[in-house]
A protein has these predicted regions:
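A nucleotide- and high-energy phosphate-metabolite-utilizing enzyme signature
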Residues: 1-193
Length: 193
């Protein structure tokens, strides 16, 4: 807080967390990403166990359909194309939120916490994991530079920041293509995969 960071947080008992998650997809999704930071790790493990028991495979279809409907509504709102001149790296089609949605669905279906667990289960291939990880790292890198250069939580790659971010990420001019063109081409290739 002292640094000006916005931190999403809540304090709940295990029973409250599970109960609220039944009716609120946002809470349920955020609890999928919960992780132990400090305190009694046994309490956290108990929470994870209770959460997974409450939201087992019998609730999976409902969760997947809701997340896909959420994604479709977001895509429609953002123009339903990944090829916009000033893309939204978080909410745009093929962007960070789409990667997160895929992983949330996989976490829900397979009760995993790590992408590599999906490789071990045979759900993903080595190539899938590499593509996903490369895309995720790219988006987070771009997003961090975007927030830093904008001095705020900005998600759109506007024209006035595309050149600066391309320089920060070492996209140099080459014969036939400026660095910013190479950067945006890479962005669109990542969103396509």
């Amino acid at each position: 807080w002292d640094l000006g960071l916005v931190v999403g947080h809540a304090t709940r008992t295990i029973d409250e967390a599970v109960r609220l998650s039944r009716d609120d997809l946002t809470i349920r999704t955020s609890l999928l990403d919960s992780r132990w930071l400090w305190g009694d790790q046994r309490v956290f493990e108990n929470f994870k166990k209770r959460f997974q028991e409450a939201f087992d495979r019998s609730t999976a279809l409902e969760f997947v359909e809701a997340k896909l409907a959420e994604r479709d509504a977001r895509h429609k709102y953002m123009g339903d194309t990944r090829y916009v001149l000033e893309p939204n790296i978080k909410e745009g089609k093929g962007g960070l939120r789409d990667l997160q949605t895929l992983f949330w669905i996989a976490k829900y279906l397979y009760c995993v916490d790590d992408l590599r667990d999906l490789l071990e289960l045979g759900v993903l291939t080595d190539k899938d994991v590499r593509l996903f990880t490369r895309a995720e790292n790219f988006f987070w890198g771009v997003r961090c530079h975007l927030h830093y250069n904008s001095n705020r939580a900005e998600e759109r790659l506007t024209f006035n920041v595309q050149s600066e971010i391309s320089r920060c990420l070492n996209y140099a001019d080459r014969s036939g293509a400026q660095g910013v063109e190479r950067f945006m081409k890479h962005y669109f290739l990542i969103t396509k995969d």
